[in-house]
Swiss-Prot record:
Record keywords, A-Z: Antibiotic resistance, Ribonucleoprotein, Ribosomal protein, RNA-binding, rRNA-binding, tRNA-binding
A single BP term in Gene Ontology: response to antibiotic
Region (Disordered): 105-124
A single cellular component GO annotation: small ribosomal subunit
Family recorded in the similarity comment: Belongs to the universal ribosomal protein uS12 family.
Basic residues: compositionally biased ranges: 108-118
Covalent S-S links between cysteines: none
Protein name (Swiss-Prot/TrEMBL): Small ribosomal subunit protein uS12
GO molecular function list: rRNA binding; structural constituent of ribosome; tRNA binding
Effect upon mutating residue 43 to T: In strain: TCVGH25; probably resistant to streptomycin
InterPro entries: NA-bd_OB-fold, Ribosomal_uS12, Ribosomal_uS12_bac
Matching SUPFAM superfamilies: Nucleic acid-binding proteins
Function: With S4 and S5 plays an important role in translational accuracy. Interacts with and stabilizes bases of the 16S rRNA that are involved in tRNA selection in the A site and with the mRNA backbone. Located at the interface of the 30S and 50S subunits, it traverses the body of the 30S subunit contacting proteins on the other side and probably holding the rRNA structure together. The combined cluster of proteins S8, S12 and S17 appears to hold together the shoulder and platform of the 30S subunit.
Length: 124
């Protein structure tokens, strides 16, 4: 334990908190190009084929991003917009692709929470 005199001379160091979305470099979103689109399985106790994409961002970082919603039109070389937000049952997936922007289409036949999935309002 330091003495009062040592604290007067040096002071206490503030702890630096780790940034959860480092690849975005402080931006709310980043544009990127899909390098690989594939499915992966979640951790126990869940079971599914989760759709994910490997994306090279404009910050020159390659990340794994989750594709939310049912069905998608993404393939290699698609331009996507990526936001932060992890997927709890997929280790290493800390980003999500924003539906309805750039090359990503919105989810078809979506009635509720449409703005999250880039779905247009139905006519009538």
């Amino acid at each position: 334990m330091p003495t009062i005199q040592q604290l007067v001379r040096k002071g206490r160091r503030d702890k630096i908190s780790k940034v959860k979305t480092a690849a975005l470099k402080g931006s709310p979103q980043r544009r990127g190009v899909c390098t690989r689109v594939y499915t992966t399985t979640p951790k126990k106790p869940n079971s599914a084929l989760r759709k994910v994409a490997r994306v090279k961002l404009t910050s020159q970082v390659e990340v794994t991003a989750y594709i939310p919603g049912e069905g998608h039109n993404l393939q290699e070389h698609s331009m996507v917009l990526v936001r932060g937000g992890r997927v709890k049952d997929l280790p290493g997936v800390r980003y999500k692709i924003i539906r309805g922007s750039l090359d990503t289409q919105g989810v078809k036949n979506r009635k509720q929470a449409r703005s999250r999935y880039g779905a247009k309002k139905e006519k009538g």
